[in-house]
C-alpha cells in the first residue's frame, strides 16, 4: 500500500511525512509482535515504565513506537471480548491497521489528519491519547455530541483500562464532584462546548480555587475537527444570565405596526410583479419594469412572485445584468433611489434589513429622530436658573427619554430583521413554546443557544411565544481562543485538506492526508440540475422510488428541516415507508443511521444527523451497488458535500452518491453567476427535465468558493475582534485566581488599587509637595470620604509629601480589607469577586454593543478593527478604574462599620 503513496499523494510535505511514518510503523509492528509474550497484568506495569522514563527525561520520540505497539497489542488481546457500550454488549473486533498507526503518528505530531469516513477514527484516537496521557497532565478528546463522548469513552475505555489508564466523559448538568473526577481521569471525553463552558464556569465561580473542575490544558484531540474548529467557530461560547439593568420589553407593542409595514410592502411587491407580468404578456417590457423587479429583490430576495418571474431565462439574464450594473459605483445613486421607493431593504447574504425614508415616514418620521444627548445634557448643566438637584433630575429624565427612543428604534429594526430574513423551519423551529436555532451547516437544533443583541426576542415576538428576558453576557470565549490555550492540539476529519490553509493560519496545524486501508470505489453520479425546487424534489422522489423497487437502500440528505419535511410528505403521498431524522436526538439518530444500509431502507436526514456512526451494508446490498446517497442540494462548502458523500462506500464497500440542485437553491440564488446560461436554459427547458452542461461543475465550485471565502473572512474577523477580549479575559481570570488564593486579601489587591489611589492623590493635591497646605489636606480627606467612603483624619496626613500620603493610604486600605466583611475568608473574597465580575460583565456588554456598531465607522473611512481595539482599550481602562474605586469604597464602608 505504501508504495502507491507517492503516486496518489503529490504534496511534498504529505509525502515526506508518510515516508518517515512507514519506517516507524514497521518498528511498531516489530515491537508489537514482541509484546505478545506479556501477560495482561504486565501491560499496566509497562505503562508505569513509560511514565517513569518520561519523568526521568527520556525523549518522547523514543517512547512513541513502544507506546503505540503496546496499544495495538492491547487491542489485539481484546478481540472477541464483550464490552458494554451505552448499556449494549458489543464484541471487540478491532486491531489497528498500518494506516491507522500512520494517522496516530500525525496526531502525536499535532497535525490535522484527513482520515476517510469509515476508517476507524475512534480507534485511531487511542494512540495519541495514550501517549499524551503518559505525561500525567490530562488528555481531552473533543467530540461533536454527548452521545459520541459517552459511547467512545465506554468503548475505548476497555482498551485504556487494560493498559492501566483511567477514562471518563463529561456532559451537561453533571454534578461538580462527578465532573472533577472525570477531568482527573487520564483521558477525558466530552464535547468542545462542554469543555469550553466548564472553563468559563470555573472562572466565574466564587468558591475555592481548588474547587475548579478542570486541571489544565495540556493536550486535546479533536474528532471531526472541521466541524468543531471551523463550523462551530463562528459562534462564540457564551454564559449569560438575566440582565439586572434591562428595561421594559418593547417588542410586543411594536408587533402591530411592524406587521402593517411588512403587509404593505408585500402588497406593493405584488402590484409591481403584476405590472411586470402585464408588460411581459404584451411584449412591452421596459427598463422601468426591470427597475421594479430590482425594487422587489432589494426588499425581499426570497419573494415567491419574483422567483416565479425569474424562471423565464431571458428575463433572468437581463435582471442579472441589471444587478451587476446596480453594484457599480456609478449607479449607486439610482440603486439608492429605487430602494427608497420601498418601505425597507433587506440583504440576504449579510442578514441585514433597514428602513428606507419611506419606511421611516410610515411610522411617522419623528420616531427615528434621536436628539443629541450630549448637547442636551450640556445645555442643562449650563442652565444657571436650576440648582444642582433639579439639574440631576433633568439629566436623568433626558437619559431615560433618550434610552426609550433608541430602544424603540432598535426594537423596530430587530423585528424587521426577524420578519424579512429569518424563516421558520429553515433558520429556526418553534418547539414546546420556544424558538430554537437550527445550525445551517448541520441541520441540528442548537440546544440552549440564543441569538444575541435582542434578535432572539424579536423572533419570539414574531412567533407569539413567551419573550424571554434579554440576557447579559457573564463570560464568553471563542472556540479558536479556547483551543489555543492548549499546549498541544491535533484533529481528525474526513475533509482536512479542504481547509488546510485555515488550520495552518488560525491554529498552526499542518494538514496531512492519510491513505485509506482499502481503495474507495464510490461511484460519483453526475449532478442533476433543475429550474425549480418543485421539479428537483419530484426528481428526487422518482430516484428514491427506482432504488426502492430493486431494494437498494437510500439516504437522502437535505440542507434544512423544512426540506426534510417536504421530502417526507412527498414520500408519504407515494406510500414509501421511510425514517426521518431532524437531528434532535443523537443516540436515537445514531441507531437509525447505522441501519440505513439495510436492504430497501429509505432514510431522510438533515446534513449531519448521525455523524460519527458507521453505516454497515445489509445482506445482498453490495450486489445492488451499495448505499445510494442523495444530496438534495449542494452545500455552501465543498467540504460538507464531501462529508455527505462519505456516508457511503466505506472500507471498500460499494456505494454511489448523486446531488440534485435547482436554480432556486440558496447556493445558486445567492452565490452563483448563471446569467450567461439563461438563453440556453430558456430554449432547452422542458418541464421536469434536468439540464445538462459541462459548465455546471465549475459554476458550483466557484459559488462554493465564494461562500467559503465569505465564511472564512467572518471567522477571521471574529478572531481579530476577540483578540482584545481574550487578553482582558486572561487578565481578569488571573486576577480572580490571585484573589482566591492570596493569604492576605488586602495586600494581594494593592497592585490593583495603587493606580487609583495615585490618581486620587494627583487630582486632589497640588503638584509640588511644598504647596500642600493644611486646608488642601483637609479638602483631600473630605474628597476621600465623599468619593470612596474612606475615613481618614487630616492630622494623619499633615506635613507628609505626596508619595508618603500615597503609601499611607495604601496601607490604610490594605488594613481595612482584613476587617469587617472582608475578614471572613469566603465572604470577603466572594464580595471582591462579585465586584470584579460585575465590572467585567459591564465591560463585555459594552464590547458586544461596540462590535455591532463599529462597522458604521467604515463609512467615515476608518478601520473597524482598529476602532474596536481602541474603544476596547478605553473600556478596559474604565473597568480597572471602576473595580478599584468600588473596592476602595467597600473598604472605606467596612472601616466606618467597624
Residue ranges, per PLM feature:
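Extended, charged helical/alpha-beta scaffold domains that provide interaction surfaces
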Residues: 411, 428-438, 442-449, 651, ...
Amino acid at each position: 500500500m505504501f508504495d502507491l503513496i507517492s503516486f496518489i499523494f503529490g504534496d511534498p510535505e504529505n509525502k515526506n511525512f508518510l515516508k518517515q511514518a512507514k519506517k516507524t510503523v514497521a518498528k511498531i509492528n516489530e515491537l508489537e509482535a514482541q509484546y505478545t509474550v506479556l501477560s495482561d497484568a504486565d501491560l499496566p506495569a509497562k505503562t508505569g515504565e513509560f511514565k517513569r522514563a518520561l519523568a526521568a527525561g527520556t525523549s518522547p520520540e523514543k517512547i512513541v513506537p513502544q507506546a503505540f505497539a503496546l496499544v495495538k497489542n492491547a487491542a489485539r488481546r481484546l478481540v472477541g471480548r464483550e464490552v458494554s457500550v451505552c448499556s449494549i454488549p458489543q464484541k471487540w473486533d478491532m486491531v489497528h491497521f498500518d494506516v491507522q498507526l500512520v494517522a496516530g503518528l500525525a496526531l502525536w505530531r499535532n497535525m490535522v489528519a484527513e482520515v476517510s469516513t469509515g476508517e476507524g477514527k475512534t480507534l485511531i484516537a487511542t494512540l495519541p491519547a495514550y501517549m499524551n496521557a503518559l505525561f500525567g497532565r490530562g488528555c481531552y478528546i473533543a467530540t461533536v455530541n454527548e452521545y459520541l463522548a459517552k459511547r467512545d469513552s465506554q468503548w475505548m475505555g476497555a482498551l485504556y483500562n487494560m493498559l492501566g489508564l483511567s477514562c471518563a466523559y463529561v456532559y451537561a448538568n453533571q454534578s461538580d464532584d462527578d465532573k472533577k473526577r472525570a477531568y482527573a481521569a487520564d483521558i477525558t471525553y466530552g464535547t468542545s462546548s462542554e469543555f469550553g463552558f466548564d472553563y468559563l464556569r470555573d472562572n466565574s465561580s466564587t468558591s475555592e480555587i481548588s474547587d475548579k473542575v478542570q486541571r489544565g490544558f495540556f493536550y486535546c484531540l479533536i474528532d471531526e475537527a472541521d466541524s468543531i474548529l471551523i463550523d462551530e467557530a463562528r459562534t462564540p461560547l457564551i454564559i449569560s444570565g438575566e440582565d439586572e439593568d434591562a428595561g421594559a420589553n418593547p417588542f410586543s407593542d411594536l408587533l402591530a405596526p411592524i406587521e402593517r409595514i411588512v403587509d404593505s410592502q408585500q402588497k406593493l411587491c405584488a402590484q409591481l410583479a403584476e405590472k411586470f407580468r402585464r408588460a411581459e404578456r404584451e411584449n412591452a417590457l421596459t427598463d422601468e419594469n426591470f427597475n421594479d423587479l430590482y425594487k422587489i429583490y432589494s426588499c425581499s430576495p426570497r419573494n415567491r412572485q419574483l422567483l416565479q418571474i425569474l424562471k423565464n431565462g431571458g428575463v433572468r439574464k437581463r435582471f442579472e445584468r441589471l444587478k451587476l450594473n446596480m453594484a457599480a459605483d456609478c449607479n449607486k445613486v439610482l440603486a439608492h433611489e429605487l430602494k427608497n421607493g420601498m418601505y425597507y431593504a433587506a440583504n440576504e447574504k449579510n442578514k441585514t434589513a433597514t428602513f428606507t425614508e419611506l419606511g421611516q415616514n410610515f411610522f411617522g418620521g419623528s420616531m427615528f429622530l434621536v436628539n443629541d444627548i450630549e448637547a442636551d445634557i450640556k445645555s442643562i448643566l449650563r442652565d444657571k436658573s436650576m440648582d444642582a438637584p433639579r439639574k440631576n433630575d433633568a439629566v436623568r429624565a433626558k437619559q431615560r427619554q433618550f434610552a426609550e427612543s433608541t430602544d424603540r428604534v432598535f426594537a423596530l429594526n430587530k423585528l424587521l430583521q426577524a420578519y424579512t430574513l429569518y424563516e421558520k423551519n429553515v433558520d429556526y423551529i418553534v418547539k414546546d413554546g420556544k424558538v430554537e436555532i437550527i445550525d445551517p451547516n448541520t441541520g441540528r437544533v442548537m440546544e440552549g443557544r440564543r441569538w444575541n443583541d435582542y434578535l432572539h426576542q424579536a423572533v419570539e415576538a414574531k412567533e407569539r411565544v413567551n419573550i424571554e428576558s434579554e440576557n447579559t453576557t457573564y463570560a464568553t470565549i471563542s472556540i479558536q481562543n479556547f483551543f489555543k490555550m492548549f499546549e498541544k492540539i491535533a484533529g481528525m476529519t474526513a475533509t482536512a485538506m479542504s481547509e488546510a490553509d485555515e488550520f495552518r493560519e488560525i491554529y498552526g496545524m499542518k494538514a496531512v492526508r492519510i491513505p485509506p486501508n482499502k481503495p474507495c470505489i464510490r461511484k460519483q453520479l453526475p449532478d442533476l440540475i433543475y429550474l425549480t425546487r418543485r421539479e428537483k424534489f419530484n426528481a428526487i422522489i422518482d430516484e428514491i422510488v427506482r432504488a426502492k423497487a430493486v431494494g437498494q437502500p437510500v439516504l437522502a440528505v437535505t440542507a434544512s428541516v423544512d426540506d426534510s419535511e417536504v421530502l417526507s410528505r412527498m414520500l408519504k403521498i407515494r406510500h414509501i415507508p421511510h425514517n426521518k431524522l431532524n437531528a434532535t436526538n443523537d443516540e436515537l439518530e445514531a441507531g437509525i443511521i447505522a441501519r440505513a444500509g439495510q436492504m430497501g431502507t429509505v432514510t431522510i436526514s438533515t446534513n449531519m444527523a448521525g455523524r460519527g456512526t458507521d453505516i454497515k451494508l445489509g445482506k445482498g446490498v453490495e450486489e445492488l451497488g451499495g448505499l445510494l446517497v442523495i444530496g438534495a442540494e449542494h452545500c455552501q462548502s465543498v467540504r460538507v458535500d464531501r462529508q455527505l458523500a462519505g456516508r457511503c462506500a466505506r472500507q471498500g464497500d460499494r456505494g454511489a452518491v448523486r446531488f440534485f440542485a435547482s436554480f432556486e437553491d440558496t447556493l445558486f440564488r445567492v452565490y452563483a453567476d448563471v446569467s450567461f446560461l439563461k438563453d440556453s436554459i430558456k430554449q432547452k427547458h422542458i418541464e421536469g427535465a434536468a439540464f445538462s452542461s459541462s459548465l455546471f461543475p465549475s459554476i458550483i465550485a466557484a459559488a462554493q468558493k465564494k461562500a467559503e471565502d465569505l465564511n472564512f473572512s467572518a471567522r477571521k474577523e471574529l478572531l481579530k475582534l476577540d483578540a482584545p477580549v481574550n487578553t482582558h479575559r486572561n487578565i481578569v481570570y488571573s486576577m480572580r485566581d490571585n484573589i482566591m488564593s492570596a493569604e492576605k486579601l488586602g495586600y494581594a489587591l494593592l497592585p490593583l488599587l495603587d493606580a487609583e489611589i495615585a490618581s486620587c492623590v494627583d487630582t486632589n493635591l497640588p503638584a509640588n509637595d511644598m504647596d500642600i497646605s493644611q486646608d488642601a489636606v483637609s479638602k483631600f480627606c473630605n474628597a476621600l470620604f465623599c468619593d470612596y467612603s474612606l475615613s481618614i483624619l487630616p492630622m494623619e496626613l499633615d506635613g507628609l509629601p505626596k508619595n508618603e500620603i500615597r503609601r499611607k493610604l495604601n496601607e490604610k486600605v490594605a488594613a481595612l480589607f482584613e476587617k469587617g466583611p472582608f475578614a471572613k475568608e469566603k465572604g470577603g473574597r466572594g464580595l471582591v469577586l462579585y465586584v470584579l465580575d460585575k465590572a467585567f460583565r459591564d465591560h463585555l456588554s459594552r464590547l458586544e454593543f461596540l462590535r455591532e456598531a463599529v462597522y458604521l465607522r467604515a463609512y467615515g473611512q476608518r478601520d473597524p478593527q482598529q476602532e474596536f481595539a481602541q474603544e476596547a482599550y478605553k473600556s478596559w481602562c474604565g473597568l480597572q478604574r471602576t473595580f478599584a474605586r468600588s473596592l476602595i469604597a467597600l473598604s472605606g464602608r467596612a472601616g466606618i462599620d467597624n
